[in-house]
Regions:
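Aromatic-anchored segments of alpha-helical transmembrane domains
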Residues: 40-48, 91-102, 140-150
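Membrane-water interface at transmembrane helix exits
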Residues: 44-52, 77, 97, 101, ...
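Hydrophobic transmembrane alpha-helices
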Residues: 2, 13-84
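Membrane-embedded alpha-helical hairpins and interfacial helices in multi-pass inner-membrane proteins
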Residues: 134-208, 221
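Short, highly charged, low-complexity non-transmembrane loops/tails of multi-pass membrane proteins
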Residues: 8-10, 206-226
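Alpha-helical transmembrane segments of integral membrane proteins
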Residues: 28-40, 61, 65, 84-89, ...
Length: 226
């Protein structure tokens, strides 16, 4: 009987310790991911502002966003190893566009939803903890900024009129020269390629998972000793 009580007590102690560890880890993850989300929002907003400096900046802003946003997004994905990560990023990006006064057309909304679904499927197929799942998933998710830009190709005349009213005829005429299917294809290919390479670079050169694991093991050993 005493042995059974001891075993039950040990199980209860272990379960309490596990619950405390999970709570501590959840707080740690939140305190880590929240700044990364803010950085992601700031970078996306900066890219949107940059895109209106010149028509060429407008074209390269999508692959540029794929490069500079890789750091915060990859770190978020390495922490959040569950379904819905890209859906959350899509919602965050959509909120950023609303704050900036950018409206999504129906076709843009479809593109955004499609990008989110494809990104989620890629990570689900390749694994939520795998590097390839992060890299390929992020490569697909890098196309999110294309959501409100696709209007240039789906309804060129209306979009050009809008741009002319906001930035002038010169800007509108220069931007109109990029309204070809070849440019759209090149933007998609370039964005996916640099998105994958950027995510790969962050994973290879900013290894936090190993350090975190070692620290957790040390804490676990100290806990067991006590």
């Amino acid at each position: 009987m005493e042995n059974k009580r001891d075993i039950l007590n040990e199980v209860q102690v272990d379960s309490v310790a596990d619950a405390q560890r999970r709570k501590k880890e959840a707080r740690k993850n939140f305190s880590f991911m929240f700044p990364m989300v803010l950085i992601y929002c700031a970078l996306m907003a900066a890219v949107e502002f940059l895109s209106f400096l010149h028509p060429f900046c407008w074209v390269v802003s999508v692959p540029l966003a794929a490069v500079i946003c890789a750091f915060p997004v990859v770190f978020i994905l390495k922490k959040y190893k569950k379904p819905g990560s890209f859906a959350i990023l899509g919602i965050i990006w959509y909120l950023v566009t609303i704050i900036l006064g950018i409206k999504l057309s129906f076709s843009g909304l479809i593109i955004t939803l499609l990008v989110v679904v494809v990104s989620e499927l890629i990570r689900w197929i390749l694994g939520y903890v795998s590097k390839e799942g992060i890299c390929f998933g992020y490569a697909a998710a890098s196309l999110l900024p294309l959501g409100h830009r696709v209007y240039l190709w789906t309804d060129t005349t209306k979009y050009m009129d809008l741009i002319a009213s906001l930035f002038g005829e010169k800007y509108s005429d220069q931007l109109g020269s990029f309204a070809t299917e070849i440019i759209l294809f090149l933007i998609i290919i370039a964005t996916v390629a640099v998105g994958y390479c950027s995510a790969r670079f962050v994973i290879l050169h900013f290894r936090t998972e190993k350090k975190i694991t070692e620290r957790e093991q040390e804490n676990s050993i100290d806990f067991q000793d006590h």
